[in-house]
Amino acid sequence: IASAPDFTEDLMWAKFDEVTKNTLLKDGIYYEPTEYDEQPYTITLPLIEDGRTHLVLRDKLGINVPIRLLHGMSDADVPYEVSLRLAEHVISDDVEVILIKDGDHRLSKSKDLMILTAQIEKLLCPNLKSD
């Protein structure tokens, strides 16, 4: 759901301005305002550095199982193209990317949850007929 592999490098570090990067390098910590909470997110230099040791979208991923990626096209935090990139990097042929046009990052609307539930049911019970 709204997959964000490599987010510390591609969605944080690469998009931080020089002031933010310098704050992290100097102080080891940066507070990122968020619309989801009154308190900002705490981003630390160790988080960024650790993320660099776990990058997965630089090579093929040896994952060969059924995969369903759900992503909102109105996600302001993680572009839906990240899910498309992830789908391209796994070796599995059984990959579906489900884009929800009005879906946001949380995909928490009733309609979104119904889509999620249906995908889980299809994966767990592939022989059941759906409506």
Regions found by a protein language model. Name each.
Residues I1-I43:
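Hydrolase active-site cap/lid region
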